[in-house]
Amino acid sequence: MPTTRETILATLHARLQTLAALALRDEVLPERIPAAGLIILRDGQPGEPEVTLSPLRYHYQHRAELEVVVQAATGRATAFDTLIAAIGTALDADRTLGGLCDWIEAEAPASVDLPVEGAAALKAAVITVILHYTTTGPLA
C-alpha cells in the first residue's frame, strides 16, 4: 500500500496529466519541448511536521515543485500565461485532491526567458505547490 505522500503526489501528477502540456514526474528535461508546453512535477520535501498527540498525527506542509517550460519563436509569453492559468484552474478544481489533502496551494511563479542557440527561446518557471496533509507517522 503506498504512503500518504506517494498517493498525494501521484494524484497531483494525474491531475496535471489532464492538461494539454506534457506532464512528467521526476524526469530529466527532454531534448524537445512539446508545442503545448512541459510540466515536470518534482516531489520536493515534506519538511518538518507539526506533531499532535492523542491520537498521534504528523501534519506536513510538503513543498513540491512544478517546472513549467514553453518554447516558441513568437507568442511565448501568451503560451506561458495560458499554461500557468491552466495549472491554476486544475488546482482550483479540487483543493483537497479528492480528500487526500487538507489543502493545496500554488505560489506565484517567477519566470525567466532562456535563449537557445539555433532554436526558439524557452520561457520557464518553477512553481512551488504546498500540500497540507496529515499522516499517522513519518513513513506512513
Predicted regions and their residues:
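Conserved short beta-strand elements that form part of the metal-binding/catalytic scaffold
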Residues: 41
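Charged, amphipathic alpha-helical segments and their flanking helix caps
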Residues: 1-33, 44-140
